[in-house]
């Protein structure tokens, strides 16, 4: 299990990006984190993946643990070897390399040739278009194909937990739906997923549990299905007019949803 407890993060010693954030990503589940720009979503992933220091950020308090291991003191390479792998926002593939070379780069930390071959076969099975274009340079792929390649490259490391940072960013609605299906399939194959998204429809559609980040704090949490029924999420993230009559939240939902206050 990936566990975040009481996490406080600042940039440059002055800008407080996360304030007392706590959440858990249980084994075998998809957990979604919603929030607007500047809410702290990317900072959360940077802290988990070990890349926070590269952005002049630091952990002031709290912890990030994967099982018994403290990730707060690990560098990105160590975190990947432990099985926690991030797909960064904006895809960031190697445009001058071919699809196959990008995938090989993702598996560089794995010295087991048979395991790398299995991982590549898994990627090509999940994304047949990447196999068709294996000799094509990454820069020539469409936006959706580049996102598939970014996810595939991360899967080459055989992650136990996959961190996805805004995978729907800049993609057409049809492709966003396909990305959601991919997330669900990755999870069905045994990988836990922490999905950071602004597209609440896709995220809540595939997640088991969800959290809402607001200016660095968790403002709401609960099951994804129940969160989707709240006025706040419907108004801010699903574009629904909550002044119109709708089915009331059930008693069970009210009990399990948690609103966080300072």
Enumerate the predicted regions with their spans.
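ABC ATPase NBD Q-loop/coupling interface
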Residues: 52, 63-79, 223
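The feature captures the beta-strand-to-loop junction immediately N-terminal to the Walker
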Residues: 34-36
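Conserved ABC ATPase signature
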Residues: 137-141, 145
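ABC ATPase C-loop
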Residues: 154-155
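Helix-to-loop junction immediately C-terminal to a conserved catalytic motif
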Residues: 49
């Amino acid at each position: 299990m990936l566990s975040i407890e009481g996490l406080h993060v600042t940039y440059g010693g002055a800008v407080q990006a996360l304030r007392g954030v706590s959440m858990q990503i249980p084994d075998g589940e998809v957990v979604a984190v919603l929030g607007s720009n500047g809410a702290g979503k990317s900072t959360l992933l940077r802290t988990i993946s070990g890349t926070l220091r590269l952005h002049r950020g630091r952990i002031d308090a709290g912890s990030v643990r994967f099982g018994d291991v403290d990730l707060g003191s690990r560098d990105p390479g160590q975190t990947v070897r432990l099985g926690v792998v991030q797909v960064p926002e904006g895809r960031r593939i190697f445009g001058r390399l071919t699809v196959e070379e990008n995938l090989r780069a993702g598996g560089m930390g794995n010295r087991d040739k048979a395991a790398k071959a299995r991982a590549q076969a898994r990627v090509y099975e999940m994304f047949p278009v990447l196999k068709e274009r294996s000799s094509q340079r990454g820069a020539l792929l469409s936006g959706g194909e580049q996102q598939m390649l970014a996810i595939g490259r991360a899967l080459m490391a055989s992650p136990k937990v996959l961190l996805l940072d805004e995978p729907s960013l800049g993609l057409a609605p049809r492709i966003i739906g396909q990305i959601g299906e991919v997330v669900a399939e990755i999870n069905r194959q045994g990988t836990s997923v922490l999905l950071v998204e602004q597209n609440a429809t896709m995220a809540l559609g595939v997640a088991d549990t969800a959290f809402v980040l607001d200016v660095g704090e968790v403002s709401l949490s609960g099951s994804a299905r129940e969160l989707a029924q709240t006025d706040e999420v419907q108004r801010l993230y699903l574009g629904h007019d909550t002044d119109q009559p709708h089915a009331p939240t059930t008693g069970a939902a009210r009990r399990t949803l948690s609103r966080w206050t300072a």
